Amino acid sequence: MKGMIMLISCLMLIDVVVESKNGYIIEPKGCKYSCSWGSSTWCNRECKFKKGSSGYCAWPACWCYGLPDNVKIFDYYNNKCGK
């Protein structure tokens, strides 16, 4: 029983330490990186360049998985694109 509690505790700690986020990556002006059908390879490369685990074209913009906390992603409520 103690071993099971220890295992669960370790897994929870790993989840906290290796926390990442998912979302639309943004350009310096705050706009999403645009893409078109068939450009998932390009989006995946852009996401990995930003230290994400992977990405794809979720038309009309690149969606990334596993981004570090310091990478800015699109936020609907704080949208600065075109302003």
Swiss-Prot record:
Keywords attached to this entry: Amidation, Disulfide bond, Ion channel impairing toxin, Neurotoxin, Secreted, Signal, Toxin, Voltage-gated sodium channel impairing toxin
GO biological process: defense response
Tissue specificity statement from the Swiss-Prot or TrEMBL entry: Expressed by the venom gland.
Compartment(s): Secreted
Family under the similarity heading: Belongs to the long (4 C-C) scorpion toxin superfamily. Sodium channel inhibitor family. Beta subfamily.
Domain observations: Has the structural arrangement of an alpha-helix connected to antiparallel beta-sheets by disulfide bonds (CS-alpha/beta).
Modified residues annotated as Cysteine amide in this record: C81
Function: Inhibits the sodium currents (Nav) in an apparent irreversible manner. Produces small depolarization and induces repetitive firing in squid axons. Is specific for arthropods (crickets, triatomides, crabs and squids), but is non-toxic to mice.
InterPro entries (alphabetical): LCN-type_CS_alpha_beta_dom, Scorpion_toxin-like, Scorpion_toxin-like_sf, Scorpion_toxinL, Scorpion_toxinL/defensin
Example GO molecular function: toxin activity
Annotated source species: Tityus discrepans
Every LCN-type CS-alpha/beta domain range: 21-82
Keyword Secreted part of the UniProt annotation: yes
Name assigned to this protein: Toxin TdNa3
